[in-house]
């Protein structure tokens, strides 16, 4: 997921994407613990996507606070 795509999302879309990514991260963590994980790079991709979404949410919240 590219930062441009994340910034284009609405707040609801960000929340939905964040929830889906966290669920996938949870599943991958179990696969890794049981030794069934096939694509180890996917875990890092998910972690970075979660960070991107949280960064955009924080930026928007700080902009709202400054605007108030």
UniProtKB/Swiss-Prot annotation:
Keyword DNA damage present in the record's keywords: the answer is: no
User: Keywords, A to Z?
Assistant: Ribonucleoprotein, Ribosomal protein
Alphabetical GO biological process terms: translation
Q: Which InterPro entries match?
A: Ribosomal_protein_uL29, Ribosomal_uL29, Ribosomal_uL29_sf
Annotated Gene Ontology cellular components are: cytosolic large ribosomal subunit
Pfam families referenced in this protein's UniProt entry, alphabetically: Ribosomal_L29
Q: One GO molecular function term?
A: structural constituent of ribosome
The UniProt entry's sequence similarity note says: Belongs to the universal ribosomal protein uL29 family.
Name of the protein: Large ribosomal subunit protein uL29
Source organism per entry reads Maricaulis maris (strain MCS10) (Caulobacter maris)
Q: What is the lineage of its organism?
A: Bacteria, Pseudomonadati, Pseudomonadota, Alphaproteobacteria, Maricaulales
């Amino acid at each position: 997921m590219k930062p441009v795509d994340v910034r284009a999302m609405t707040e609801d879309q960000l929340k939905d994407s964040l929830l889906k990514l966290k669920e996938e991260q949870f599943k991958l963590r179990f696969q890794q613990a049981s030794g069934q994980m096939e694509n180890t790079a996917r875990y890092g991709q998910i972690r970075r996507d979660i960070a991107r979404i949280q960064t955009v949410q924080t930026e928007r919240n700080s902009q709202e606070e400054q605007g108030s």
